[in-house]
Amino acid sequence: MSAFITFEGPEGSGKTTVIQQVAQKLENQYSVVLTREPGGVKTGEQIREVLLEGDDMDDRTEALLFAASRREHLVGKVIPSLENGKLVLCDRYIDSSLAYQGYARGIGIEEVKSINEFAINGLYPDITIYLDVSVAVGRERILKNQRNQNRLDQEDVKFHEKVVEGYKKIIHNESERFIVIEADRSIDEVVNATYESISKYLEKL
């Protein structure tokens, strides 16, 4: 059984930790492929380094690079995995571009969506898990955990508040695709809630 499940959330939502632990739980029942964006394949990882560790760049260039990395990732990893009946869990996907570049950068959600629709060629997630946490809590976690901060982490509070606003708009418009998980709880609680939600969805397939 194949399914494409993406994970989204603002910085400090615990997304990467949650997806890894949820994947371990799901592996007891399913053949799971865990991947991430930007990255996931060699070319995608090279673009990731430019995007997250490089110097400041034009907003539209940033959006185009994310879309290019996404296309390489789909063709090289996601699509083959789905065709082989895998359960694909992806750390970030198109909604990140819409929230970060489309809304927070001010390019426009519809403009960035058009770029990405060309890249994904109709391959939307079956469901998207959104880990909902406030900007204040997210930034506090990043500082507490002493996580290496990339170029996007270092944006100011207003930028990250806009990211959350952008996500909320996207979720409002596509509520049937999203499962919203309160992520201001302990990691164990968030992992369990996420695992239960995904399991319920998969049982219906």
From Swiss-Prot:
SUPFAM superfamilies: P-loop containing nucleoside triphosphate hydrolases (SSF52540). It catalyses: dTMP + ATP = dTDP + ADP. Signal peptide: none annotated. ATP binds at residues 9-16. Pfam families: Thymidylate_kin. One of its GO terms (molecular function) is dTMP kinase activity. One of its GO terms (biological process) is dTDP biosynthetic process. It comes from the Bacteria. It is an enzyme of class 2 (transferase). InterPro entries: P-loop_NTPase (IPR027417), Thymidylate_kin-like_dom (IPR039430), Thymidylate_kin_CS (IPR018095), Thymidylate_kinase (IPR018094). Keywords: ATP-binding, Kinase, Nucleotide biosynthesis, Nucleotide-binding, Transferase. The keyword Signal does not apply. GO terms for cellular component: cytosol. The keyword Metal-binding does not apply. Its EC number is 2.7.4.9. Phosphorylation of dTMP to form dTDP in both de novo and salvage pathways of dTTP synthesis. HAMAP family: Thymidylate_kinase. Belongs to the thymidylate kinase family. This is Thymidylate kinase. The lineage of its organism: Bacteria, Bacillati, Bacillota, Bacilli, Bacillales.
